[in-house]
Design a protein with these regions (language model features):
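Short, conserved turn/kink motifs that form compact alpha/beta structural patches or helix kinks used as
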Residues: 2-8, 39-156
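Polar/acidic, low-complexity leader/linker segments enriched in S/T/G and N/D
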Residues: 2-36
Length: 157
């Protein structure tokens, strides 16, 4: 089930004008955390008024330097956010009203209507492949909502 939320900065802070992108966040309810299923379950959420940046740069590898994309997404603080350990405790119906962010989740730039079912051609890997380079797997996450201003969730990949 997909949700769509306009993420706003709360408590009267002024909206950052760079937060003008839409992203689709795919949250993975991992099989090891779900006693009712032996497979990952994916939830799609469309988030408006976010910051999205995709930069091509050099990274070191075993074989020397290579070119790779580096992604940064910032989502303004939202009442619809739950930390993963709280999100997984919600019923499926309640979970549909919230989003979370954790490693191995996926982000696609823009509004993506595809669902991840786990069956070909709707696997996470296939969705990622279809939408590259505008899609990535989350490899870094920080909750920056304790800041005095500009409260947000930062996602990297």
């Amino acid at each position: 089930m997909a949700g769509s939320y306009g993420a706003y900065v709360l408590r009267g802070d002024v909206m950052n004008p760079n937060y003008n992108q839409t992203v689709t966040l795919y949250n993975c309810f991992r099989a090891q955390d779900n006693p009712e299923s032996r497979k990952d379950i994916w939830q799609r959420t469309v988030l408006d008024r976010c910051f999205y940046k995709n930069v091509m740069g050099q990274v070191e590898s075993r074989d020397g330097l290579k070119m790779a994309n580096a992604y940064t997404v910032r989502i303004p603080e939202s009442e619809k956010y739950k930390p993963y350990h709280e999100w997984i405790k919600l019923s499926p119906e309640e979970r549909a009203g919230y989003f979370t962010c954790s490693l191995k989740d996926m982000i696609v730039e823009g509004e993506c209507l595809e669902e991840i079912t786990g069956a070909t051609p709707f696997t996470a890997a296939e969705l990622l492949s279809r939408h590259k380079p505008e899609a990535f797997v989350v490899t870094a996450f920080s909750d920056n909502t304790s800041h005095l201003t500009g409260k947000h969730y930062r996602i990297g990949g």
